[in-house]
Swiss-Prot record:
Organism: Geobacillus thermodenitrificans (strain NG80-2)
Protein name: Aminomethyltransferase
GO BP annotations listed: glycine decarboxylation via glycine cleavage system
Annotated catalysed reactions: N(6)-[(R)-S(8)-aminomethyldihydrolipoyl]-L-lysyl-[protein] + (6S)-5,6,7,8-tetrahydrofolate = N(6)-[(R)-dihydrolipoyl]-L-lysyl-[protein] + (6R)-5,10-methylene-5,6,7,8-tetrahydrofolate + NH4(+)
E.C. code: 2.1.2.10
Subunit description: The glycine cleavage system is composed of four proteins: P, T, L and H.
Family stated for the protein in its record: Belongs to the GcvT family.
Length: 365
């Protein structure tokens, strides 16, 4: 039986086409992936991401506990700030990538990938000791993401909080949005400005409908996971199971900014990551652009000078750039920009070239 989010009852009203994703029945699109993608790049779009996992970590031992598990330096957080980080196993394979919200002195909220929630909770529980309390609040929490250049203007109609004062990777809890008590976070997964809004599950429909009503004149569209994927891909934001996995390290995925190999005491996987940092990771995530006609897809093999060199992690025809592009994990020695490679597309080796990433970066307003 697939899980459903608190917004499932209103999907049909907005024309949702649903698919299975990580054990959930989720909307892949409402109008079309291209339309929704372009709405977010030029106006704004509203996503239901209530399938994501939320885990609370509390108690006097919270900080040392998180420091032991996280690749980033959690001590740098302050109440009201958000940090991107990862958890690794001893061999530096990625357990998950996540966001940490510091709510109070010994009070943290971890937001993890939907398909990994149970695995992550078990991993955290296995390593918890001392004064640490863990609580999985995913079932009672809804999460909506309003993303795009018009996001602030639209959301401001529904709240007295001055949204312009909220910096990226900051949040405020207990904010009334359309009379719904909400945690408002300036974060997202699209490469655009935007907000992620956490509320009680029973308030999700009220909040969803209020935002779409407030955004009607700005052309805000309900958006599905299809556009979420093309948007995050153009911005080169990793997706667990594709750019990250138990066999892909954060350094191979190009996430060195979130890996603090000098941290003391060391975190799980730190020794291997330190070696990778010093020697250079054996593989690197690169951007590829097709020269021949064809679309690189997840799992397609990549060749360089006739030898197998890696595989495509994500690929599509970019709605913004109108090019056939992909991300690929390849041997470090063939990862140079300008390197010509071949992608095996249905038995044919088609030419591509390694290009700079991210493919898309929004202009700073």
């Amino acid at each position: 039986m697939l899980k459903r989010t608190p917004l499932f009852p209103v999907y049909a009203r907005y024309g949702a086409k649903t698919v299975e994703f990580g054990g959930w029945e989720m909307p892949v699109q409402f109008s079309s992936i291209k339309e929704e993608h372009n709405a977010v790049r030029t106006r704004a779009g509203l996503f239901d991401v209530s399938h994501m996992g939320e885990i609370i970590v509390r108690g006097g031992g919270s900080l040392p506990f998180l420091q032991k598990l996280m690749t980033n330096d959690v001590a740098k957080l302050r109440p009201g700030r958000v940090q991107y980080t990862l958890m690794c196993d001893e061999s530096a394979g990625t357990v998950d990538d996540l966001l940490i919200y510091q709510k109070g002195e010994d009070d943290y909220l971890l937001v993890v990938n939907a398909a990994n929630t149970e695995k992550d909770f078990a991993w955290l529980s296995e390593h918890a000791d001392g004064d640490v309390e863990l609580e999985d609040v995913s079932a009672e929490t809804a999460l909506l993401a309003l993303q795009g250049p018009a996001a602030e203007r639209v959301l401001q109609k529904l709240t007295d909080m001055d949204l312009s004062a909220l910096r990226p990777f900051s949040f405020q809890d207990g904010v009334e949005v359309a009379s719904v008590k909400t945690l408002v976070s300036r974060t997202g997964y699209t490469g655009e400005d935007g907000f992620e809004l956490y509320c009680q599950a029973e308030d999700a429909i009220t909040l969803w409908e209020a935002i779409l009503t407030a955004g009607a004149e700005d052309g805000v569209l309900p958006c599905g996971l299809g556009a979420r994927d093309t948007l995050r891909f153009e911005a080169c934001l990793p997706l667990y199971g594709q750019e990250l996995s138990a066999t892909i390290s954060p350094l191979e995925a190009g996430l060195g900014f979130a890996v603090k190999t000098e941290k003391e005491p060391p975190f799980i996987g730190q020794a291997v990551l330190k070696q990778q940092k010093e020697a250079g990771p054996p593989r690197r995530l690169v951007g590829i652009e097709m020269i021949d006609k064809g679309i690189p897809r997840h799992g397609y093999r990549v060749f360089a000078a006739g030898e197998e060199a890696g595989f495509v992690t994500t690929g599509t025809q970019s709605p913004t750039l109108k090019k056939n592009i992909g991300l690929a994990l390849v041997k470090a020695e063939v990862a140079a920009i300008g390197q010509e490679v071949e992608v095996d597309i249905r038995g044919k080796r088609l030419k591509a070239t390694i290009v700079p990433t991210p493919f898309y970066k929004r202009a700073k307003s």
